[in-house]
Amino acid sequence: MLPAILAFCGFYVAGSNQQMFNDATQVVLMRQGTRTVLSMQNNYKGPPEAFALVVPVPSVLHEGDVKTLTKDVFAHVEQMGAPRLVEYWEQDPCHPEPPMEIQFAGGAGVAAMPVRKMAGADLGVKIEAQFTVGEYQIVILSAKDSSGLETWLHQEKYNIPEGAEPLLRPYVESGMKFFVAKVDPQKVKFEDGRAALSPIRFFYDSDRFELPIRLGLANSSGTQDLIVNILAGDRYEVANYPNVTIPTNLDVTPMVKDKFPAFYAALFDRTVEQHPGAVVTEYSWAAGSCDPCPGPTLQPGDFATLGADVTKENLGYGYVLTRLHARYGKDIKDDLVFKAAQPIVGGREIKNATGQLDNEAKPASQNNFQGRYAIRYPWTGPITCDKPQRGIWGGPPAGQTQQGPQAATGLAFAPRGQVQLAQALAKPDQAKFGGGAFSGS
């Protein structure tokens, strides 16, 4: 079965014997120097009893390191980095406009938490800090033994997912701390049976830039997907797994207009089938610009919300937004480790030396890579000149309205099996593509 969920770097534990699953998490990492700011928006599917989030962190976090956010910034980031669908019309071959690239317009307060007497010392567990942020009751734990940590969580009435102790062990042995954010369901709104939790952000300093995903396997029933957005001065890729880029500049048939998320899901599935174990780069672009733009660009206020207010230097419009998409199962061995990479370009309406559009990423002087897919409408009017110039694309004929680029958002819930690539691609031979295997490594 293909995954219909997005995983996260921690696991969720419920205060009942029912399993708590995470089915859609958005993660945004801001990185500058040794500082990492991690922001996440969680959707939960489970009973409304007390539940918690457990995430390994490299150091003890304090009240000022944690805050809640509003949800709109995550929708903004997702829209900017998402694959986009555009429409082009062939211009009058006898009166073409000069060829050019087409552009489109496009915390809660913190309160003290009562201290409870626990037998943590006997279990090798120490409460390093505890505080409340919004609906989150947070404790920062250190542990000398993974079994002791598991026992402590059991004593606190949490039903740890089966198989959690071996997953906790490497983090305990490496000296990691544990961010445990318990949620008070009386402070949470439930919409259609789903908890609408406030996004949460915290930051820390570490020489290593990584995301601990192995602990999330405790909630996994099989294969999981994870989308990570990184805001930094450079493009980023993973250092410990293969890197590929999503095939781009593919022309599609008009039927894709109503099934774009399903089309992209099929394209991504084909890509990971051809490159098992690889992490897919779906977007890498200056965060303050885009072309085509599916919506407003990210603004200084967005950067501040996502961490620029706690980094040494606010890069303003100098941030690069990188979107990485990973698929993994229970056999994954290592967390995702990130490294800076050279700029790439791809997914633009710029022809190469052979007069074709490249379907793969290429090295470049600046980051301009996106997953871009186009519906093209050939010229159907009269041709009244001796030397028509075909293949010049632009906006629609006079009097016809053009919709802006369509972004494939909400891919955690994109339907699978509705689109066959061979029928969706305007050039069926592209269904055999092996492209996208660019790596700056």
Set out the residue ranges of the language-model regions.
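Surface-exposed, glycine/proline- and aromatic-rich loop segments on solvent-exposed faces
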Residues: 30-90, 149-170, 175
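Short, compositionally biased low-complexity segments enriched in polar/charged residues
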Residues: 13-31, 113-126
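Accessory, solvent-exposed terminal regions and/or long lumenal/extracellular loops of proteins
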Residues: 10-21, 110, 160-441
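Short alpha-helical segments and helix-capping/turn motifs at coil-helix boundaries
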Residues: 21-26, 36-40, 123-126, 165-166, ...
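Single conserved position on a long alpha-helix in the C-terminal lobe of the eukaryotic protein kinase
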Residues: 96-157
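Short, well-ordered loop/turn elements at secondary-structure boundaries
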Residues: 23-24, 31-34, 47-48, 122-127, ...
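A mature extracytoplasmic/lumenal domain signature
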Residues: 42-44, 57, 142-145, 185, ...
